[in-house]
A protein has these predicted regions:
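N-terminal beta-loop-helix "entrance" segment that forms/cooperates
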Residues: 49-72, 228-230
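Glycine-rich phosphate/diphosphate-binding loop of Rossmann-like nucleotide-binding domains
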Residues: 24-45, 152-224, 236
Length: 331
C-alpha cells in the first residue's frame, strides 16, 4: 500500500504542539453537514487537540442576498484562527453569485492547492495499484483570476493571468514539498507550444527554480499528452505542478484513476492561512439519506492535523480509516 497521508510533511506545517489549536469550521451545504459531523466526531474520539469556531457560509448566506456567500464575522474568524476546515458548499445557479471557493482562496492568499492521489489497492478498486501522485496546483491566477468581460452581445472574453511572482511561489513550493517528503521527481505540465507568453513564463520559471534542487529530477510535459500519460501510466509521475485550470481538471481525473474522487482530500496553503476540504461537491440530491461517504473530508482533516503539528493524531485517524476499508466498510 502507498504511504499514508499522515506521514506527508507540509512545508508550512507548525511544530508539534500539545495545546488546543484554534480552527474555523464550516458545515457547508447538501451532504456537507452530515460528513462534517462524522469527521468531527472521529477527530474528537482520536484525541485531536482543537478549539473549534463554527461559521455559516454558502447557500443560505447567498439566498439572504449576499452575493459572496460569506459574512464579515466569518472573515474575522478565518483571519484569527488561520486554519479552515470546510465542507462542500452549493453556489446557486444563475448570474451574480461568486464562487466562494475562489473568493476564499484569493482573499486569504491560498496560492497552493495540494492534492495527494493515492491508490488503496486491493481495498479500493483501481487499475493502477502503485499510484502515488501529488498534484500541486497554482490556486490564484490563470483563467480563475476572474477577469471576464463582454465585448459584444455575442462575444465574451476571459483573460489568462500568469505572473512571475505567482509562478515562483507555486513552483518553489512544489520543489520544497518534494524535498521534504523524500520524493524523487517534479514534473511541470503546461501548454507553451500554443500559449507561448503565459505558459511559457511558467515553464521558464520552472526551469530556473529546478536548478536549486539538483537532487530532484525535473521534467516537463505538454499538458494534453501529459494528461494521456497520467491516465495510462500514473506510476511515471511523482509530484506534478501546473497552472490553475489544468490542476483543477487533472487532480479530479487523477483522484478517480487512483480509486475515487470521493476519497480524496486537499489542502489549500498560503503564507499565513490554510484551508482543508474534500475535493468533491455538495451533492444535494444525496443529502439527508445517510449514504454520503465522509472519507474525502476526513482526508482533508488528516492533512489539517499534519499542518497544525498533530501528526500523532493524523496517523491514528488514518490507521483507523485504513482498517475500516480493509474490513470492507466503504461505498
Amino acid at each position: 500500500m502507498s504511504p499514508q497521508p499522515a506521514s506527508v510533511q507540509d512545508p508550512s506545517s507548525a511544530r508539534v504542539t500539545s495545546t488546543p489549536v484554534p480552527i474555523t469550521v464550516a458545515h457547508g451545504d447538501g451532504i456537507g453537514p452530515e460528513i462534517m459531523s462524522a469527521t468531527l466526531r472521529i477527530l474528537e474520539e482520536a484525541g485531536a487537540r482543537l478549539k473549534i469556531e463554527t461559521i455559516d457560509i454558502g447557500e443560505r448566506i447567498y439566498l439572504q442576498g449576499n452575493s459572496a456567500g460569506i459574512e464579515p464575522h466569518a472573515w474575522e474568524s478565518l483571519r484569527r484562527t488561520k486554519v479552515f476546515l470546510k465542507a462542500p458548499i452549493t453556489t446557486p445557479q444563475g448570474g451574480g453569485f461568486k464562487s466562494l471557493n475562489v473568493t476564499v482562496r484569493k482573499t486569504l492568499g491560498l496560492f497552493a492547492n495540494v492534492r495527494p492521489c493515492v491508490a488503496y489497492h486491493p481495498f479500493v478498486d483501481t487499475r493502477h495499484p502503485g499510484m502515488d501522485v501529488v498534484i500541486v496546483r497554482e490556486n490564484e491566477e490563470d483563467l480563475y483570476a476572474g477577469i471576464e468581460h463582454r465585448q459584444t452581445d455575442e462575444v465574451m472574453q476571459c483573460l489568462k493571468l500568469i505572473s512571475r511572482p505567482g509562478c515562483e511561489k507555486i513552483v518553489r513550493y512544489a520543489f520544497e514539498y518534494a524535498r521534504l517528503n523524500q520524493r524523487k521527481k517534479v514534473t511541470c505540465f503546461m501548454k507553451d507550444n500554443i500559449m507561448k507568453l503565459t505558459d511559457g513564463l511558467f515553464h521558464r520559471v520552472f526551469d530556473e527554480i529546478s536548478k536549486d534542487y539538483p537532487e530532484l529530477t525535473a521534467d516537463h510535459w505538454i499538458v494534453d499528452i501529459g494528461a494521456a500519460k497520467l491516465a495510462d501510466t500514473p506510476e511515471a509521475f511523482d509530484v506534478l505542478v501546473m497552472p490553475n485550470l489544468y490542476g483543477d481538471i487533472l487532480s479530479d481525473v487523477a483522484a478517480q484513476i487512483a480509486g475515487s474522487v470521493g476519497l480524496a482530500g486537499s489542502s489549500n496553503i498560503g503564507e499565513h492561512c490554510a484551508m482543508f476540504e474534500a475535493i468533491h461537491g455538495s451533492a444535494p440530491r444525496r443529502a439527508g439519506q445517510n449514504v454520503a461517504n465522509p472519507s474525502g473530508l476526513l482526508h482533508g482533516a488528516i492533512l489539517m492535523l499534519v499542518h497544525v503539528g498533530q501528526s500523532d493524531v493524523a496517523e491514528r485517524v488514518h490507521n483507523a480509516w485504513l482498517r475500516t476499508i480493509e474490513d470492507g466498510q466503504h461505498t
